[in-house]
């Protein structure tokens, strides 16, 4: 420092320098402040996110802790018991059957005793207090209902080894007796319950003494079809006389009861339709049920669309059961159901198909004597103490000679109608049911009749029937030898049936379809029908039973002198002569 410089100025200069340095530092710090602020803000955001995650983790841990505590409490609870509710008292106490004892218990405050139903399952805590109401038992023993007692709350049932006991009816079963006049009472809106009837199978808890549910019996339900068949008399061809006979026997008594009463005429109890297979026996029975329902609906002033009748179609062979008494029980249940339906004033037809398989002549069985008890059961149902008002029995068989004579006597199956094989006129009528105007016809065949479809179809039917019923060499079928030595040649027309005619038409339609695919020429031709006849006859060449020719002939509808020998005579085929075997009696079951 020079001597000339003022000390004050020097100090001021140093201070100014220091201020400049400080200002520079402040400028640098000011420039760095926004970055620090941003860093701090990002740190704050990161810490907030971590804090939220920690809070969520803490909540989840707290919830898991609560759930584990509840699980520990649940596992530590004493076991609950179950019982069947027997009765509810005015003081809110209830009687419960539990652990083999009948006990009077109290209910938890959250249980409304007014909603409890008899027979319901309830849950009990360790103090034997009802804490929860359940459903109904779904397992137990099967018992057969004998009868419902007058109070409608109890029933007599038969259990294992024919042990009888009185049981209470659970609420779903007891509810159907609230209105004695009603046949259907909806205990639950989603599942209407029908009235119980003797023979029903019930699910029973024998210890608690309650019946909970009606169990359908598949072995009986499968045997019976309750329906109105959609078959009309117009659908049946060639059986006009037989249809008139069965209408007189079945429809007149139902439609004109006053006239029958005035003339003291008892309506027939049953009808037997017999004849060769495939000739329309079952079809007639179905048409009777349909026609009867419509006629009665018209007589009552109802719409024919609302016509109602019951056609109980009994599958004969399936009715048989290897256990003693089961077949008879099924027959009793079938007629019990028929009486129930008929009590409403609705006609009921009980149709036994293949009647000879069930009600065979007593004493004719070789390996079984089941017919000795089954036949009397049917007889007692038809003309026993309990009447069959509005019920008629129709039987069908192609071996009427094997049915027990007691069933066929007047007063049981009064009317016997033979369904014969169709003659030429009947065959034309049957063909007309299948060859209808709506079928496509080949243009060449139509051209022969000037495009008249009706005339063309009629001519086709006439030509086909003439071909089938001609006693020509190509139509020879069998040569039969009788026991007295006489011989007779039988033609295919002697074994024709409605089922065979339907099969011929179906074959012809198939040929017409194949013709369209092969040649592109649409329409049915008479040649298709001729080819179908040849094929149908050829298929039947080996069908005759030459081991027991007489039994086969009886089933086929050929009765008379006993046949001991059969030889096929089909043209163009190698007919093999069968050796003659004398037929033994009662061999029908081996056919």
UniProtKB/Swiss-Prot annotation:
Optimum pH is 7-8. GO terms for cellular component: proteasome complex; proteasome-activating nucleotidase complex. SMART domains: AAA. ATPase activity is inhibited by N-ethylmaleimide (NEM) but not by sodium azide. Residues 590-591 are annotated as: Docks into pockets in the proteasome alpha-ring. ATP binds at residues 278-283. GO terms for molecular function: ATP binding; ATP hydrolysis activity; CTPase activity. Belongs to the AAA ATPase family. Homohexamer. Assembles into a hexameric ring structure that likely caps the 20S proteasome core. Can form a complex composed of two stacked hexameric rings in vitro. Probably interacts with the prokaryotic ubiquitin-like protein Pup through a hydrophobic interface; the expected interacting region of ARC lies in its N-terminal coiled-coil domain. There is likely one Pup binding site per ARC hexamer ring. Upon ATP-binding, the C-terminus of ARC probably interacts with the alpha-rings of the proteasome core, possibly by binding to the intersubunit pockets. PANTHER family: AAA-FAMILY ATPASE (PTHR23077), PROTEASOME-ASSOCIATED ATPASE (PTHR23077:SF144). Consists of three main regions, an N-terminal coiled-coil domain (residues 1-77) that probably binds to protein Pup and functions as a docking station, an interdomain (residues 78-227) involved in Mpa hexamerization, and a C-terminal ATPase domain of the AAA type (residues 228-533). This is Proteasome-associated ATPase. It comes from Rhodococcus erythropolis. The lineage of its organism: Bacteria, Bacillati, Actinomycetota, Actinomycetes, Mycobacteriales.
């Amino acid at each position: 420092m020079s001597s000339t410089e003022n000390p004050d100025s020097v100090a001021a200069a140093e201070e100014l320098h220091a201020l400049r340095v400080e200002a520079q530092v402040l400028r640098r710090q000011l420039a760095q402040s926004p970055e620090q602020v941003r860093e701090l803000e990002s740190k704050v955001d990161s810490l907030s996110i971590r804090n939220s995650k920690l809070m969520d983790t803490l909540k989840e841990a707290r919830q898991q802790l609560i759930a584990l505590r509840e699980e520990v409490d649940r596992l530590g609870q004493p076991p609950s018991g179950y019982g069947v509710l027997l009765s509810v008292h005015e003081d809110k106490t209830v009687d419960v059957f539990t652990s083999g004892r009948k006990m009077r218990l109290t209910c938890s405050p959250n249980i409304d005793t007014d909603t409890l139903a008899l027979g319901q399952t309830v849950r009990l805590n360790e103090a034997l207090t009802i804490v929860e109401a359940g459903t109904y038992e779904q397992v137990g023993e099967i018992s057969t209902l004998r009868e419902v007692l007058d109070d409608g709350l109890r029933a007599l049932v038969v259990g294992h080894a024919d042990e009888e006991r009185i049981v209470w009816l659970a609420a779903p079963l007891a509810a159907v007796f609230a209105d004695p006049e009603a046949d259907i009472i909806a205990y639950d809106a989603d599942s209407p319950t029908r009235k119980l009837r003797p023979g029903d199978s019930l699910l029973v808890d024998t210890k608690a003494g309650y019946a909970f549910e009606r169990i359908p019996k598949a072995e009986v339900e499968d045997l019976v079809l309750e329906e109105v068949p959609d078959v009309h008399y117009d659908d049946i061809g060639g059986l006009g006389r037989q249809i008139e006979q069965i209408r007189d026997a079945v429809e007149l008594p139902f439609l004109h009861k006053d006239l029958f009463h005035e003339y003291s005429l008892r309506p027939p109890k049953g009808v037997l339709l017999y004849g060769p297979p495939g000739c329309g026996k079952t079809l007639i029975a179905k048409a009777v049920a349909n026609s009867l329902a419509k006629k009665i609906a018209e007589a009552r002033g109802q719409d024919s669309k609302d016509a109602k009748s019951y056609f109980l179609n009994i599958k004969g062979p399936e009715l048989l059961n290897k256990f003693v008494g089961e077949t008879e029980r099924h027959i009793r249940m079938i007629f019990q159901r028929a009486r129930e339906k008929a009590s409403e004033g609705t006609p009921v037809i009980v149709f036994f198909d293949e009647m000879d398989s069930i009600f065979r002549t007593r004493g004719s069985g070789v390996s079984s004597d089941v017919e000795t008890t089954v036949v009397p059961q049917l007889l007692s149902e038809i003309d026993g103490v309990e009447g069959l008002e509005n019920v008629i029995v129709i039987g069908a068989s192609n071996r009427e000679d094997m049915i027990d004579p007691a069933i066929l006597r007047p007063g049981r199956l009064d009317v016997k109608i033979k369904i014969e094989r169709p003659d030429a006129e009947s065959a034309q009528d049957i063909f007309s049911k299948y060859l209808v105007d709506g079928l496509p016809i080949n243009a060449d065949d139509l051209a022969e009749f000037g495009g008249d479809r009706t005339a063309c179809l009629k001519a086709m039917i006439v030509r086909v029937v003439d071909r089938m019923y001609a006693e020509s060499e190509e139509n020879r079928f069998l040569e039969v030898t009788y026991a007295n030595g006489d011989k007779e040649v039988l033609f295919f027309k002697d074994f024709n049936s409605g089922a065979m005619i339907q099969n011929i038409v179906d074959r012809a339609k198939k040929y017409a379809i194949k013709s369209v695919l092969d040649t592109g020429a649409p329409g049915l031709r008479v040649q298709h029908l001729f080819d179908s006849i040849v094929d149908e006859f050829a298929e039947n060449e080996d069908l005759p039973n030459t081991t027991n020719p007489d039994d086969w002939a009886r089933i086929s509808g050929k009765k008379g002198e006993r046949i001991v020998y059969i030889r096929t005579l089909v043209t163009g085929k190698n007919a093999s002569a069968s050796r003659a075997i004398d037929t033994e009696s009662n061999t029908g079951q081996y056919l």
